[in-house]
């Protein structure tokens, strides 16, 4: 049966010597009005064990009816999600208002992979509490004092992504029972959102039915949605209150609303309450949250170009796949093939006792080839046995050969997706040998994903097979929904965005870090890393992430302070201040369980087992190695709930099974290279321990150009007064293929009759690399051919693409280097958002040591070939603090004024005063021609010289 009833009441005259507590009358929390509301027209209050009469019109005999045997007085669910860590409590209160003993069943569905942390039960005032014990200890305790008339246990359900916790208690007339179960789980991001499911199946009407879900996310909520999962019956019942970082979902139907029809006694509450949400992401380096000696790092970058993939579909077409399973698989594969991108390469292998391939090598996913592959799949006729070993080795051979021959894009990712519904029956039958063969032949750049269809397949084998080869396994339930399950899984891995993702926390006081090295990152998902630290030794935690995108090597940095969350969590009574510890424990235990299944020796397995057991006991959670012992205060009545055999792969619901690397093993290419302008440090570090070069050519403010002439050792300044929207060429070097242009933005309004202009956007074009970089006051975007990569000013990161490297320091500076011989620095100037006049703007700094060609020109580029100047006849000016002088340059004699300008490289707020000689009239006479000669039509246009 697909959905089980949460409360099943079976009535029989029991002669079992159970745990019976005689009381008189009904429980104090059930009154006559409650019963009338739950079953109108059915009840009259009578003494215990008596009957009541009701005369029916036209009938002389009496009809005797009994009071409803069991009343569900209260059914409450409270669930709190704090930074993806969900803690849920399910509580029900039941009263036996029958004159006979009744068996009361508490049967609730919880997500697979959730850890039960507590269970308690009160039977007419006598409380049973739970404790976590090692399985053998728990069974021994249970054997000593078995509770009569009571059972408890965890049951693996055949339904999708759920299991059942079931307790059965025999209670006497009038007795009340309260059940309360607590469990915890991590919310994994899939296809762009987190999904929180609460299974509501009370089985009958409840006087008080209340569900409350609190979502608390420090990152901020991007959206929150409660879909209709009850076919419109409870339209308008869920109430959603959403703020910037917190939301509350309330579901409290009245008894009348619960009824499946106006006069029915059956409940319509039979299904799932689902909450979908996602969080805001401002930083590419993710969200690093630190609290109470633990940290959690959430990483889910977007706005990245997909990495091309080489994908082999290996499909079981043995006789056991006949019928619905094959039909659904074919339907799913047709959709999946249509979703392949033009830059992808693919092939299809189908196998029974024989191995067939649609193509013996990888083929581009053109429309023609996809159509041909779909026709091939449609003709498949399942029959015969199952030769998994040869099928996987054939797939591995195709990918290995293509890679060895250089046929694969070096920036692509390679995937094998195996779909099978049974164990091998032909060829190699020993599962450990198949696992060994795959491991010995597969190259390290290949990820193997296994989809086990139905329950005849050895799912534990598929888990080991995939976890050992950079993938995961997932069970596909063989029913009418098989096609959508297959398509949903493919969608999760269809968009690889990063390769070789590694998290580093460079400090010795950071310990016990969970898996921090991942083969791939797929769009719409999220990687989560957690660890411990010593608060006495650290007041902040630094993270450095290295990864490779479609065409770029990345270094992403972030920093978190110890007290960042203290104020936020203290202001919300529902926030879980222990979420970092729980999340770390959840990840660690799940990863240890996966490692245990792959342990190469018995000694290693025993060591891992001891670690899992100790953590299970320390954190009070039920795992496959522990039992839930439920006992009364006297200790003479006990129940036992064992977890079922482990079914989910690592971190149930997670898309990644990674590995661990030492904390300081950052790739050599990730170490930021020194630049001649500014040292790129982590956010929060002190800026510029070493002094930047004192002399650069720069543009700041309105826009003020400061040109340093090394031979003369003079700074010459000029302004450009132009219109917003105009694009000025700063450097144009057609021989080197380098362009630097700047687009002007205007102030909000004129000041003293003059509208100031600033650089609001800068464009850099490196022609030989086909790389364009656009820097605005909001984003930094790198384009290479048809691919793009964006960062925001809130990131601290380093991006390397061929000869070009971009370093971003959060809210301060972007440094661009070319072959480590040429550099440009762009400073960000933020102003108060409500300032009546000023706007955010950019400043650019270019060292005169940059090796441009002699043909370089532009407002700055022309001075790479230093002109001769002669400054003489210095004299007092109209302003006593600004003397005047004459300057001969380029055959012209100019009147110049000495003053001060600002260099903001070492002090972004106040700047450092720099003495310079100012050329009036927009640099006329000092620059070649007129400033309007330097207008260009596009942000990446070369300057056309007359």
Curated annotation (Swiss-Prot):
GO biological process: hyaluronan metabolic process
Subcellular location: Secreted
GO molecular function: endopeptidase inhibitor activity; hyaluronic acid binding; serine-type endopeptidase inhibitor activity
Propeptide: 19-54, 703-946
Modification sites for Phosphoserine: 60, 466, 886
GO CC annotation, single: endoplasmic reticulum lumen
Reported modifications of this chain: Heavy chains are linked to bikunin via chondroitin 4-sulfate esterified to the alpha-carboxyl of the C-terminal aspartate after propeptide cleavage.
UniProt key word Transferase: no
Glycosylation sites: 118, 445, 666, 673, 675, 691
Tissue expression pattern: Plasma.
Signal sequence interval, chain numbering: 1-18
Keywords (A to Z) from UniProt: Disulfide bond, Gamma-carboxyglutamic acid, Glycoprotein, Phosphoprotein, Protease inhibitor, Proteoglycan, Secreted, Serine protease inhibitor, Signal
Chain positions with Aspartate 1-(chondroitin 4-sulfate)-ester modification: 702
Disulfide-bonded cysteines: 261-264, 650-651
Domain VIT, chain residue ranges per copy: 56-185
Residue ranges occupied by any VWFA domain in the UniProt entry: 308-468
Keyword Nucleus among UniProt keywords: no
Segments for region (O-glycosylated at three sites): 665-679
Residues bearing PTM 4-carboxyglutamate: 282-283
Function: May act as a carrier of hyaluronan in serum or as a binding protein between hyaluronan and other matrix protein, including those on cell surfaces in tissues to regulate the localization, synthesis and degradation of hyaluronan which are essential to cells undergoing biological processes.
Similarity section: Belongs to the ITIH family.
PANTHER family xrefs: INTER-ALPHA-TRYPSIN INHIBITOR HEAVY CHAIN FAMILY MEMBER, INTER-ALPHA-TRYPSIN INHIBITOR HEAVY CHAIN H2
Protein name: Inter-alpha-trypsin inhibitor heavy chain H2
Encoding gene (name): ITIH2
